[in-house]
Amino acid sequence: DPAGITTYSVLGADYGYQLLWVLVASMLALIVLHDLAARIGVVTRQGMIGLIRQKYGARSGTLSAGALVLANVGTMTAEFAGIAAAGQLFGLSKYVSVPVAAIAVSFLVLRNSFSTVEKVFFVISAGFIAYIIAGFMAGPDWGAAAKGVLIPTIPFTQEAIFIATATIGTTLAPWGLAFIQSYAVDKRLTKDDLLF
């Protein structure tokens, strides 16, 4: 998630621990909203766009679907920009890394079952453990971090408000809610699958 990594990095680089509470609040909201979206999918057996169409009509459903497509295009653009940047760190041209990645992802998604794709991305996501390890290796000031999490403060500057808003926006992406709700439907989850 290059957009998220960039946003979180700017948040930390520019404000240290001061706005850490924004990240924690965003993650808590992410957990609650994704849980809610999954529950809506379980109970209604419909994805988000289908429910919008049913409740508000075809025009609203079409507009919502269009907005999600635009959001997905933006997200994919950011992902491939991240692939290009990562490739350049290793001396690989973006004109090589991006097409190779696009072909590999397209092949994976279009030529394999959903279950296989899910397993591959689950294994790849294990790489995120490196962020946790790097965080501990950086030797943070745990007292300042706790203060940044527990005592919300924000400098009332345009830059601080912008990065706080960007953090919330990159964490709570609407396409993620639509995906989770549809995922619950596609996996045929039932009320018995819910923990509470």
Regions found by a protein language model. Give the residues of each.
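Hydrophobic alpha-helical segments and their helix-loop junctions in multi-pass secondary transporters
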Residues: 126-153, 157, 161-182
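Transmembrane alpha-helical segments of multi-pass small-molecule transport proteins
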Residues: 63-66, 89-110, 127, 131
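Select transmembrane alpha-helical segments in multipass membrane proteins
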Residues: 57-70, 156-167, 196
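Membrane-water interface regions at transmembrane-helix termini and the short interhelical loops
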Residues: 79-89, 102-124
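Hydrophobic, small-residue-rich membrane helices and short re-entrant helix-turn-helix hairpins
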Residues: 7-10, 178-196
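Transmembrane helix-boundary motif of multi-pass solute transporters/channels
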Residues: 1-26, 81-84
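Juxtamembrane transmembrane-helix boundary signature
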Residues: 22-55, 64-70, 74
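Helix-loop-helix connectors at the membrane interface of multi-pass transporters/channels
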Residues: 50-51, 55, 79-98, 185
